[in-house]
Amino acid sequence: MNTNRFDVIVIGGGHAGTEAAAAAARLGRSTLLITHNLETIGALSCNPAIGGIGKGHLVREIDALGGVMGRLADASAIHARVLNQRKGPAVRATRIQADRPTYARAARRALDALPGLALLQDAAEELLVADQRCYGVRTESGATLHADAVVVTAGTFLAGQIHIGHVQHSAGRAGDPAADRLSASLRDLGLAVHRLKTGTPPRIDRRTVAVEQLDAQHGDTPRPLFSPFRPPEAPLPEAACLISWTTPETHRIIRDALDHSPMYSGAIQSSGPRYCPSIEDKVVRFADRDHHQVFLEPEGLDATELYPNGVSTGLPFTVQEALIRSMPGLEAARITRPGYAIEYDYLDPRGLTPWLESATIAGLYLAGQINGTTGYEEAAAQGLIAGLNAARVSAGEDPWFPTREEAYIGVLIDDLVTTGVTEPYRMFTSRAEHRLRLRDDNAEDRLTEVGRRLGSVGDDQWTRFARYRDALNAERARLNGTRVHPGRLTASQQARLGGALRRDQTLFDLLRRPELSYDDVRFIGGLEEADLPVRAVQQLEIEARYDGYVERQELENQRHQRYAQVRLPEALDYAAIDGLSTEVRERLTRMRPATVGQAARLPGVTPAAISLLLIHLRRRGWLRTPTGGEDAA
């Protein structure tokens, strides 16, 4: 066996690299994961949390395709909630707080358990390319490693530069060296390299926090899961989050120190994540606000550190101390690790195919923050797709990628490769025009059979899913096949119905009524109880009540396509359009798209924003049913 020859080489052991290596190995390809430190595989470099709105949808889809992130999150969860429970099912999403060391250990165990996957502690320094094909990697130790495909998942390590006030130093993250030579290798290949910025807050010693003065936020019971068909064997105990907030004094401290912030002193010119701004940006952009909520998230069950979510900063250490101590409950808090801003290289994702292979260098795949995204979940989703396709193409098979209609992963990738990024890309449900169909509750229905065909879904997961699917389909058929008739209901059934029944209806039709539960319609129909898990019952209720909304959204999407060629008035005032986000207003005002279709293709302009734009045009009398490319004005 040639120990320097592999089917797939993955560079980087973060969330994208973990998914890429695991996916390639699951498909039976000999795989090598190279990372500068084996002890940091799967590290939660920033916040100790997985999921959230849009992001949780990605994790559910990763799991449905056989990926590992959902399973790792469940195994390390110490706090879990379903967000947006008062809103519609399409925007509900799971978010967990993870025990940081447990998550990393679980990631390492998951990789160690895969036959055909080797790990190497080394630094990849040069991509080997000949005739526009990548055939391997040269490392810091001098090793030359060959492969049919190479997946680069370098995170913030490409020419990474940390800023704390006016102090700067090279690093991929605190305590880890930057990958300067790998970045230079990418530039030497003629790839379009640019810079982005992100940041992290200081960590706080929990023992110096007045816990009794702060409200606690507990998780949901029962604890929600990302991976329902691969549940953890021994769930961890819960740890509550604490809630504090910034004060007018906090904001004064920050405003007085803006000249020392790398984002405001000119030291950093690149764009940061709009939806995860630094505390400096919050104070400047929302000058009318006198406070911002701060969640103090536990780093782990045995950890003494708290992560203050909401105060990412690159201010000097002394300023960080002052602003932390100006918040309730933190008056005596001690910082254990300073926050910092970090700049890093990324590549223009418009140079990629939809299966994340370079359009100019065959066999080279890119995934994660190197493509301009932010967040563990976005990185993991890309890593999964890149790893699957590196494995498939190296085996002579056709590449595969999900479409926008199939998955949030498809929305993510299509946005990246079609419109590119000008700031770190974060997933939101509003980015998906088919979001009513792409729900958290039906990820397996949409993708697990696909994952099985691809070879990514294992036997145990498939068996559990198939059992669930069959039970769900059988009960759906039973509800659709059982009719109730006016005048044939007993008094108790009529009482449960809560009103008159004017015509024959199936039980599934009755389930569309929001006031009736699954148990209600089963009782009304005289059906015996079925052996269904709770989530199957919930899914049936959601399906019944959402069918009409899904159809309506599909009609709306078709309407958007019809109006794509409608021209926009040159003097259109986007600030006057109700409901548009600041990001969308700024982008439309700056870019001045000529048509509705051009507006829809701009980064950050969501399908929901296009609907608001069309409503505005119609109200002003500027919109007519298109028969061609006529002017809206």
From Swiss-Prot:
It is found in: Cytoplasm. Pfam families: GIDA, GIDA_C_1st, SAM_GIDA_C. GO terms for cellular component: cytosol. One of its GO terms (biological process) is tRNA methylation. InterPro entries: FAD/NAD-bd_sf, GIDA_C_N, MnmG, MnmG-rel, MnmG-rel_CS, MnmG_C, MnmG_C_subdom, MnmG_C_subdom_sf. GO terms for molecular function: flavin adenine dinucleotide binding. Keywords: Cytoplasm, FAD, Flavoprotein, NAD, tRNA processing. FAD binds at residues 12-17. Its main location: cytoplasm. Transmembrane segments: none annotated. NAD(+) binds at residues 272-286. PANTHER family: GLUCOSE INHIBITED DIVISION PROTEIN A, PROTEIN MTO1 HOMOLOG, MITOCHONDRIAL. HAMAP family: MnmG_GidA. NAD-binding protein involved in the addition of a carboxymethylaminomethyl (cmnm) group at the wobble position (U34) of certain tRNAs, forming tRNA-cmnm(5)s(2)U34. Homodimer. Heterotetramer of two MnmE and two MnmG subunits. NCBIfam families: mnmG_gidA. Belongs to the MnmG family. This is tRNA uridine 5-carboxymethylaminomethyl modification enzyme MnmG. It comes from Halorhodospira halophila (strain DSM 244 / SL1) (Ectothiorhodospira halophila (strain DSM 244 / SL1)). The lineage of its organism: Bacteria, Pseudomonadati, Pseudomonadota, Gammaproteobacteria, Chromatiales.
